[in-house]
Every structure is written in C-alpha cells, then in structure tokens.
Amino acid sequence: TKANIGRHGGDPGFLVITGGSAGGHLSSLAALTPGLAAYQPGFEDVDTSVAAAVPFYGVYDLVDRQRGATRGLEELLSKRVIKTTLVDDRANWELASPISHVGPGAPPFFVLHGTNDTVVPVEQARSFSTALRDTSRQPVVYAELPRAQHAFDILPSIRTHHAVHAVERFLAVVRSRHGGATP
C-alpha cells in the first residue's frame, strides 16, 4: 500500500487503518504488529506500520481475560476461523488477540463501541482501551456509544454522523501531530 498510495493522491507517510467487527479485530492486530515476520509472510521486509488505527466494535481478546466478554464467540472462532480450540492451542489464540500485542510502540488509537452490542460485548473495547492507555505512549481515545448496537454505523443516522465527525477530528489531530497538514 505504501509503495502505491502516492499514485492515487495518498500520503505513504500517513496511512491509517480501520475496520468494523472482524475488521476492527484485524485492523487492531495489524496496527499492533508492524514488521513482525510471522504476520506478514512473503513480505517480511515491508514497512507495515500505520500512523493510527480506528477500530469499530472489534474483538480484541480472544482468550477472554475478562470472563464472559466473548459470549459464545469461542465456539464460532474455533469452528470457522482459528480451527482449533482455546484449550488445545491457547498460544495461537493469544497471538491472534490484539490485546496481547499492546505496548509502548502502539500507534494512536480511536476505539468505538456501542453499549448494546449483542455480538461483541462492550467489555472487549473497555479492556482493550484501558490496556492501550496503560502502556501506549500515543493518544488513545475511547468512545462508548449509549444504546448503540453492533454495526451501528451501517445505516445513516445522527449517531453515525457524530461518530464519523469524531473520527475525522481525531485523525486531523493525529495528522497535525504527525507533521502533515490537515485537510
């Protein structure tokens, strides 16, 4: 992406990653594991760092350190995604958990999650944001949206508008601190 983004008007020095649900999980994992060969087979020498991450309603702790914060996700993940159980291969589940990779080098994060999410419990975002704030040297913003459900931003609404506006403001601040002009 960094090698080609300039051809399309983008700035290779300011790449931001985002995603919702599984994309929230994967974007967080990618943001926290730049340059780790195990996560980028075939392009181990490529700079995969990002300037910021903005995950929406993601799963951040697959091993469920909070007890009950995965509410049935373990069965789905073991059958369809990881293809092994947590009991049989805890190390692999840890490696796939963004919270396991939180550290001082984490990029700025803006985590968004709804309180009424029935797919991914809000406790996932709370504990992830707390872990980031406790260890990262960069800004960490957490927006917990009252009564918002999973995928709250799919349909246009006032809530979606405000969430998008908040993300835009966050990225403008990160961009200005990153040394780039804000749009």
Predicted regions and their residues:
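Alpha/beta-hydrolase superfamily serine-hydrolase fold, recognizing
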Residues: 1-183
